[in-house]
């Protein structure tokens, strides 16, 4: 594992360039936020992908060896391997950093509120990483992203039919918002975390129609 990690991360120029772009844009939007002083690569023993401590970011390179890395079959589920690629590192770092600075706070903790919160994060990530494909930002494959776009109306019909938007039950929230092989509340053909995708669509629609924001 150590040897493979060193090989795959021997050249990190593109990673560094993308991070510089992301944090430069972040500093422009939030000048009071402290930009991380260092980003370290390390082998985590398959325990950590991205960590943030005392203004230092650590990236567990053994968590990004590629979705086809054979050993992953022994330690993670198939659906988790999609995000265990080098291409996902920048999005994971920026997402973790935003979560550290922008806490979720809701009086009722309804599904719609969680959707919109995550949608705002995704929208902001898109502004910070304009060159990243949208599916990479949310951690989908391009095929999963295309499925969501193709069946967007059916997704909404299902959500409204079940009256899920204002539910607060933990099982419902978990099904829509947490990682999994699919979003059980919608269909087994869907990708997981479909609530995050829906939230992003809501925020995108709002921002398109309210350009003064």
Where are these regions (language model features)?
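Acidic/His-rich structured neighborhood in mature extracellular/periplasmic domains
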Residues: 2-145, 213
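Non-transmembrane alpha-helical segments in soluble domains
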Residues: 27, 125, 156, 160, ...
């Amino acid at each position: 594992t150590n040897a493979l990690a060193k090989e795959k991360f021997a050249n990190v120029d593109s990673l560094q360039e993308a991070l510089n772009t992301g944090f430069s844009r972040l500093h422009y939007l939030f000048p009071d936020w402290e930009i991380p002083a260092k980003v370290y690569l390390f082998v985590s023993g398959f325990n950590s992908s991205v960590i943030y401590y005392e203004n230092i970011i650590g990236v567990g390179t053994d968590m990004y060896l590629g979705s086809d890395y054979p050993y992953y079959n022994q330690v993670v589920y198939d659906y988790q391997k999609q995000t265990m690629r080098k291409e996902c590192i920048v999005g994971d770092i920026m997402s973790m950093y935003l979560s550290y600075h922008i806490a979720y706070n809701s009086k009722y903790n309804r599904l719609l509120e969680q959707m919109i919160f995550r949608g705002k994060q995704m929208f902001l990530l898109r502004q910070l990483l304009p060159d990243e494909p949208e599916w990479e930002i949310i951690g989908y494959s391009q095929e999963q992203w295309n499925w969501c776009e193709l069946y967007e109306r059916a997704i909404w019909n299902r959500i409204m039919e079940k009256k899920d938007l204002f539910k607060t039950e933990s099982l419902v929230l978990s099904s829509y918002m947490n990682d999994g092989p699919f979003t059980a509340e919608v269909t087994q053909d869907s990708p997981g975390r479909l609530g995050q995708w829906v939230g992003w669509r809501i925020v995108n629609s709002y921002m398109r129609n309210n350009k003064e924001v």
